[in-house]
């Protein structure tokens, strides 16, 4: 039975990962060893079997005893510990939610419903580093994997509507505080049916712009507004989040020689934990819409084709409908006015499940089954 070290299991992604591992009985198949950065010797989580007290996540000697390390501790931890561990001669498998190693030549970005062949080839070749992808990229590929598999995508534009969870737990809390502050500023007016909506709107706008409005984490109002920039600014005018779309899509698909152009604008919106994306796909040939729907819907068990009608789209193609589920609905599928090779689509997915935790959990299972 493989000794598997879990690090960062208390954080947001780590907690979702733990919940999924319990649901799928993954702990039955491993000898779990839990690590901490702050509570060495403390009590580990309840996973249905005896576990040792918490070990020091910075102890190279402890980490070296493991067959697999599964970390959701973040990029700073990876940058500090990973090189020391490899230098110490550790030959185990490193599975990581953080982006630090994502684009390294000796790392594979894992999304097995899309790139299982790439993963298997890497395992056969002795690759030891398996990294979770960017959440929007993973969710887009889960939705449109069928089109990429069929070699139909010439280029793609992704305009995103990204949830607060992508920025972290404190940001989710801040979004709710912002919503609460906006509501509190006009609660009395809302209770009075005779109050004028333009007066209410003016008061809300004043609240959003006030110094007292809680923006410590986002740096700007998100509740009742949006933020048209995610991550660092790059010299070419892209945000780093936008750069990831093409870089990671092609790395996941192992398209190093002839990359598919992917670009767009990434926007933070007031959703809690589901990212949505409006996609424009340039096909390299004219394919009937019914064939496209078949390719998409048959690609993996989680993608869900939503018919392009108003009622079902409003009901099923939203963050509220999808949050907390592994379902990746894709809808609004239609040929665009630009021509028969231009396809429009809209997709939604849980940023913490297929966007983060689930590909890591499944990578562990792939290792255990070998």
UniProtKB/Swiss-Prot annotation:
Q: Which UniProt keywords apply?
A: Amino-acid biosynthesis, Diaminopimelate biosynthesis, Lysine biosynthesis, Methionine biosynthesis, NADP, Oxidoreductase, Threonine biosynthesis
Task: List, alphabetically, the SUPFAM superfamilies matched.
Answer: Glyceraldehyde-3-phosphate dehydrogenase-like, C-terminal domain (SSF55347), NAD(P)-binding Rossmann-fold domains (SSF51735)
**Known catalytic reactions:** L-aspartate 4-semialdehyde + phosphate + NADP(+) = 4-phospho-L-aspartate + NADPH + H(+)
Q: In which pathway does it act?
A: Amino-acid biosynthesis; L-lysine biosynthesis via DAP pathway; (S)-tetrahydrodipicolinate from L-aspartate: step 2/4; Amino-acid biosynthesis; L-methionine biosynthesis via de novo pathway; L-homoserine from L-aspartate: step 2/3; Amino-acid biosynthesis; L-threonine biosynthesis; L-threonine from L-aspartate: step 2/5
| Pfam families to which the protein is assigned, alphabetical | Semialdhyde_dh, Semialdhyde_dhC
Q: Name the residues annotated as catalytic in the UniProt entry.
A: 135, 275
Q: Give GO terms: molecular function aspect only.
A: aspartate-semialdehyde dehydrogenase activity; NAD binding; NADP binding; protein dimerization activity
Q: Where does substrate bind?
A: 162, 241, 268
GO annotation, biological process: 'de novo' L-methionine biosynthetic process; diaminopimelate biosynthetic process; isoleucine biosynthetic process; lysine biosynthetic process via diaminopimelate; threonine biosynthetic process
SMART domains the record matches: Semialdhyde_dh
Q: Which residues bind phosphate?
A: 102, 244
Q: Where does NADP(+) bind?
A: 10-13, 37-38, 73, 165-166, 193, 351
E.C. designation(s): 1.2.1.11
**What function is annotated for this protein?**
Catalyzes the NADPH-dependent formation of L-aspartate-semialdehyde (L-ASA) by the reductive dephosphorylation of L-aspartyl-4-phosphate.
The family classification in the record reads: Belongs to the aspartate-semialdehyde dehydrogenase family.
Q: How does it assemble?
A: Homodimer.
Annotated protein name in UniProt = Aspartate-semialdehyde dehydrogenase
**Gene name tied to this protein:** asd
């Amino acid at each position: 039975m493989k000794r598997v070290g879990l690090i960062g299991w208390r954080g947001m992604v780590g907690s979702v990962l733990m919940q999924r591992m319990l649901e799928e009985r993954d702990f039955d198949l491993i000898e779990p060893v839990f690590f901490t950065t702050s509570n060495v010797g403390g009590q580990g989580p309840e996973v249905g079997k005896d576990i040792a007290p918490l070990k020091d996540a910075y102890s190279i000697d402890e980490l070296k005893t493991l067959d697999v390390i599964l970390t959701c501790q973040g990029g700073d931890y990876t940058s500090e510990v990973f090189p020391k561990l490899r230098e110490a001669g550790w030959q185990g498998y490193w599975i990581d939610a953080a982006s630090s190693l994502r684009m390294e030549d000796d790392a594979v970005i894992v999304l097995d419903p899309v790139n299982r062949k790439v993963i298997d080839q890497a395992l056969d070749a002795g690759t030891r580093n398996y990294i979770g992808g960017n959440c929007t990229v993973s969710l887009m590929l889960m939705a449109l994997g069928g089109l990429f598999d069929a070699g139909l995508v010439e280029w793609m534009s992704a305009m995103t509507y990204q949830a607060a969870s992508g920025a972290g737990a404190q940001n989710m809390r801040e979004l709710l505080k912002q919503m609460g502050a906006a509501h509190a500023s006009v609660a009395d007016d809302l209770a009075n049916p005779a109050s004028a909506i333009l007066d209410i709107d003016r008061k809300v706008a004043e609240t959003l712009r006030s110094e007292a409005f809680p923006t410590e984490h986002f740096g700007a109002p998100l509740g009742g507004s949006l933020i048209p920039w995610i991550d660092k600014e790059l010299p070419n005018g892209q945000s780093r989040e936008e750069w990831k779309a093409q870089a990671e899509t092609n790395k996941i698909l192992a398209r190093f020689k002839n990359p598919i152009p992917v670009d767009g604008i990434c926007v933070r919106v007031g959703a809690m934990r589901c990212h949505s994306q409006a996609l424009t796909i340039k096909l390299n040939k004219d394919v009937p819409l019914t064939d496209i729907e078949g390719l998409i819907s048959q690609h993996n068990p989680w993608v869900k084709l939503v018919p392009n009608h108003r009622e079902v789209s409003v009901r099923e193609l939203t963050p509220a409908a999808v949050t907390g589920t592994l379902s990746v609905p894709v809808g609004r599928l239609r040929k665009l006015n630009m021509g028969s090779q231009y396809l429009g689509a809209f997709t939604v997915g849980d940023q913490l499940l297929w966007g983060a935790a689930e590909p890591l959990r499944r990578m562990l299972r792939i290792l255990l089954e070998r």
